[in-house]
Amino acid sequence: MKNVRELLQVNEESLPKLYCDLDQVLCAFLDGAKFVLGHDFVKSDRETRWKKIANFKGFWDNLQWMPGSRKLYQRIAKYDPYILSAYSTRDANSRTGKHKWIAKNTRVPKSRVILVKRAQKQSYATDKGEPSVLIDDYIKNIKEWEQKGGIGIHHTSVSKTLKELSNLGFK
């Protein structure tokens, strides 16, 4: 007969697919933008800020980790997560730079990196009729994800996200 510990143990194969956003979850996009712009990202018009970022060599691949996000990455890494991130249509370097950042800072293979337009994220909310999990800082993405049948974790702090992951069986 199985003991209680064995009965409560979650089978990792039964866990849902796990997707993690990049900007403001793992890497500090807004801090990088502030460095380039000399002020907060939203304090200049869209065209000006994106032009400055696009002209700043190595912007994307040299972003710093978000505070505490290495701990988050270490937790999810053992579950072979996907990185699901929106690329900027205003900066042709964003796709390549994000791939470089991921290659330099994580062990997520290129085959598990999905860069899409923001509105396309929700199309990954389920897999073969089963809900997938998305960790994302942008509440609109979480709401759209959940409306499509997925499980959303609104990332506002590493400790909160880790707790929610644990509740889902990602120990």
Regions from the language model: what does each represent?
Residues 27-30, 35, 81, 90-94, ...:
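Short catalytic/ligand-binding loop motif for oxyanion handling, primarily in non-cytosolic enzymes
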Residues 11-57, 147, 157:
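Active-site neighborhood of HAD-like aspartate-dependent phosphohydrolases
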Residues 82-95, 99, 103-123:
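A short, structured active-site edge motif that brings together acidic residues
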